[in-house]
């Protein structure tokens, strides 16, 4: 696989974040924070009326995008900031751009700026990643 500086990464898109999956993930992860499954709890905290997606799930969308592009076991480094919430029903789009291509040891690597945007354009996750180009 080849990559060039400035190349856009193939987008990964989810049409609507599922409140049922938020609740299921909260149960599996034993996440006690009710903002992921109780609309009243969200409203009581002044966070609106929609459930808030878990940060690790939002991060997972970015990882899905990277691995769909470069394949399994290609992720070498990932650093992100959570800059906004993702709510139930939101469309999300993970994307990125190649910022450098380099050789390191026996691997050809691509450094990338990565993000997750809500459908309204709000950036929810922003960061950098390094992937092996195979």
Task: Specify the residue positions occupied by each region the protein language model found.
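HotDog/MaoC-like acyl-thioester-processing domains
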Residues: 1-11, 85-134
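Hot-dog-fold acyl-thioester-processing enzymes
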Residues: 1-74
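Glycine-rich loops and low-complexity Gly/Arg-rich segments
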Residues: 35-41, 76-77, 104-106, 121-122
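Short C-terminal domain-edge/linker segments immediately following a structured domain
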Residues: 41-47, 82, 127-130
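Mid-chain, well-packed structural core segment of small domains
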Residues: 66-94
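Short, intrinsically disordered/low-complexity patches at protein termini
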Residues: 33-35, 60, 76-77, 82-83, ...
